[in-house]
UniProtKB/Swiss-Prot annotation:
Pfam families: Ribosomal_L22
Record has Iron-sulfur as a keyword: no
Designated gene of the protein: rplV
Entry-linked Gene3D superfamilies: Ribosomal protein L22/L17
Function summary: This protein binds specifically to 23S rRNA; its binding is stimulated by other ribosomal proteins, e.g. L4, L17, and L20. It is important during the early stages of 50S assembly. It makes multiple contacts with different domains of the 23S rRNA in the assembled 50S subunit and ribosome. The globular domain of the protein is located near the polypeptide exit tunnel on the outside of the subunit, while an extended beta-hairpin is found that lines the wall of the exit tunnel in the center of the 70S ribosome.
Name this polypeptide is given: Large ribosomal subunit protein uL22
InterPro entries xref list: Ribosomal_uL22, Ribosomal_uL22_bac/chlpt-type, Ribosomal_uL22_bac/org-type, Ribosomal_uL22_CS, Ribosomal_uL22_sf
Domain of life, per lineage: Bacteria
């Protein structure tokens, strides 16, 4: 049985989070949490939050034993992009894209 958790609208680009997601895919829960705890990437915070939510869902909603769980699927989709303006000299302006992402984690036995 697979249990899902989603984190939508995380304020980080999907490209940065995918670097972290690739490291924990297929690992056991304990190993994945260790990797995320000692990672110096900003995306590790978001992935860890979503993974802990999936673990809590498995334990509370489905009564699964968390010692036997592993990260079966993890993927990161692009969210909405917020367009912002940065004023520059002589009346000009630059466009800033603030990217977001949606993180989906599935844990199973």
């Amino acid at each position: 049985m697979e249990v899902t958790a989603k984190l939508r609208g995380a304020a980080i680009s999907a490209q940065k989070v995918r670097l972290v997601a690739d490291e924990v895919r297929g690992k056991s829960i304990e190993r994945a949490l260790d990797i995320l705890a000692f990672s110096n990437k900003k995306g590790a915070v978001f992935v860890k939050k979503c993974l802990e939510s999936a673990i809590a869902n498995a334990e509370h909603n489905h009564g699964l034993d968390i010692d036997t769980l592993k990260v079966s699927t993890i993927y990161v989709d692009e969210g909405i992009t917020l367009k912002r303006i940065l004023p520059r000299a002589k009346g000009r302006a630059d466009r800033i894209s603030k990217r977001t992402c949606h993180i989906t984690v599935k844990v199973g036995e």
